UniProtKB/Swiss-Prot annotation:
Source organism (scientific name): Methanocaldococcus jannaschii (strain ATCC 43067 / DSM 2661 / JAL-1 / JCM 10045 / NBRC 100440)
Function, as annotated: Antitoxin component of a type II toxin-antitoxin (TA) system. Its cognate toxin is RelE1 (Potential).
Protein name as it appears in the record: Putative antitoxin RelB1
Protein origin, superkingdom: Archaea
Keywords: Toxin-antitoxin system
Amino acid sequence: MLNINKEIAQIETELNELKKLRDEISERIEKLEIKLLKLKALAIPEEEFEEDYEEIIEDVKKSLDKKETVPAEEALKELGLL
């Protein structure tokens, strides 16, 4: 019985460590996705951006909503688009 309890404790510890790593990775992915969107927005020529402003905002919203990592509104504010 002692061995079973010891094994349970080890598995719980490992599981908690993995969950923490998962959360950290998710946070890093989220930050990188926002950074990538910012860089993509900066790479759009100003003339094209002005012409397609609404379309660009909708594309960003759709892209973010599919990934469900960051609310689209939050990301657009972060990009300075709202």
